[in-house]
Amino acid sequence: DVRVNDCYPGHEFKIDSSTEFRLTATATYPTDYPTRFECIVNGEVVKNATIQSIRKSPSILLLKLEKKIEFDSSSWMAIRCTQKMPNGNISFAHSAPFFFMKQNEPIRPRKVEAQYLLERVENEIRRHQQVLTPEQLEGYHAARKFYREQLKVAR
């Protein structure tokens, strides 16, 4: 269960310079395997989130996260749980994002994200150039233009 000010993921909050929010999140996991519970803001793990672990039974662990959060720019936030399984695979759950919007300010992507997506689109253009018609490539060209613009405003 993940909530901000008792609202569920997907909610969009309006922010100003003095808005504080209360994040609460809980997850139940088998304790046989290492588990991480993380608060993600704009794609990066928030380092100062405190996690409380409560043993519900010999094999079940309840993880709780409570945090006061503030944003000085438009942002998104989500919660992620990961667990390393004995076979080496990673099991994970990720909430939908909450949105915190400052008036007239879009959420700016990180440079590394915009660059990665631009490179992916350019690779797809190269890969399909000999196969698709110019009309069929228009969507890729529009995406390339979009990610080039995102790269200019990225943080």
Locate the predicted segments by residue.
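C-terminal functional module detector
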Residues: 1-155
